[in-house]
Curated annotation (Swiss-Prot):
Pfam families tied to this protein: Ribosomal_L2, Ribosomal_L2_C
Region (Disordered): 200-274
Purpose: One of the primary rRNA binding proteins. Required for association of the 30S and 50S subunits to form the 70S ribosome, for tRNA binding and peptide bond formation. It has been suggested to have peptidyltransferase activity; this is somewhat controversial. Makes several contacts with the 16S rRNA in the 70S ribosome.
Protein name: Large ribosomal subunit protein uL2
Record GO terms (molecular function): rRNA binding; structural constituent of ribosome; transferase activity
Origin species: Parabacteroides distasonis (strain ATCC 8503 / DSM 20701 / CIP 104284 / JCM 5825 / NCTC 11152)
Keyword Ribonucleoprotein assigned: yes
Length: 274
């Protein structure tokens, strides 16, 4: 999946770098796998703002993604590669041999017409999903479960991948994209390969309007706010704001926010890089 750097015909085009849609083969999603999606504007059920800088944007419909891949032993053919407005990666439409249809996150190298399968007996090939107990050591994987049968929770964004480094008893040792090394039950499933659309990280909006299309509002700096709005606000004229803090008053640079007694810490062998 490539990128397009536009010619500077207007100020908004000058620095714009967008993804190329050359690998996308269908413009309309599968109707049975699409549901409506209500925009929240960053508000919760009581109307209170819980997330700043969200609002507006183009109306989006949610594509139902199969993160469980539990149709074991039934081969599926890749019908199309599609754009999904709800995530950075592309999605692939699968037609199963029994007539079922589903969407999966499209891994790098997956082509239309290719056959994928899930289950313990599946070959460790791109797009196939199998328990990590059956995946060879050193394999690049994504869409990793944290609990067997729960569905993929980790390594799902564009270009992301983890590596199965070793196995110890009932656990598989995984090196995560963050650099963290941790144990996960070997009965958990993972999909072979890296997530596609790796050039997503190189994209640039080019203009404020494109950010608004995506539902991103202007992000105001704390140092230019009033003291009532932010710990770094106020002062006479321009001020440095003192020690960088979040809006809640926590130190913004270097403070560890992970709970010291979190139960899952015993599964982490090596903490992530800074």
């Amino acid at each position: 999946m490539g990128i397009r750097k536009l010619k500077p015909t207007t100020p908004g085009q000058r620095h714009k770098v967008i993804g190329a849609f050359d690998k996308i083969t269908a413009s309309t999603p599968e109707k049975s796998l699409v549901v409506g999606k209500k925009s929240t504007g960053g508000r919760n059920n009581t109307g209170k703002m819980t997330m700043r800088y969200i609002g507006g944007g183009h109306k989006q419909k949610y594509r139902i993604i199969d993160f469980k891949r539990n149709k074991d032993g039934i081969p599926a053919t890749v019908k199309s590669i599609e754009y999904d407005p709800n995530r950075s990666s592309r999605i692939a439409l699968l037609y199963y041999a029994d007539g079922a249809k589903s969407y999966i996150i499209a891994p790098n190298g997956l082509e239309v017409g290719q056959t994928v399968v899930s289950g313990s007996d599946a070959a460790p090939e791109v797009g196939n999903t199998l328990p990590m107990a059956n995946i060879p050591v050193g394999t690049i994987i994504h869409n990793i479960e944290l609990r067997p049968g729960q569905g993929a929770k980790m390594v799902r964004s564009a270009g992301a991948f983890a590596q199965l480094t070793s196995k110890e008893g009932a656990y598989a040792i995984i090196k995560m994209p963050s650099g963290e090394t941790r144990k996960i039950l070997a009965a958990c499933k993972a999909t072979i390969g890296a997530v596609g659309n790796s050039d997503h990280a190189l994209e640039k909006s080019g203009k404020a309007g494109r950010s608004r299309w995506l539902g991103r509002r202007p992000r105001n700096r704390g140092v230019v706010m009033n003291p009532v709005d932010h710990p770094m606000g106020g002062g006479e004229g321009r001020s440095s704001g003192g020690h960088p803090r979040s809006r809640n008053g926590l130190y913004a640079k270097g403070l560890k926010t992970r709970a010291p007694k979190k139960h899952s810490s015993k599964y982490i062998i090596e903490r992530r890089k800074k």
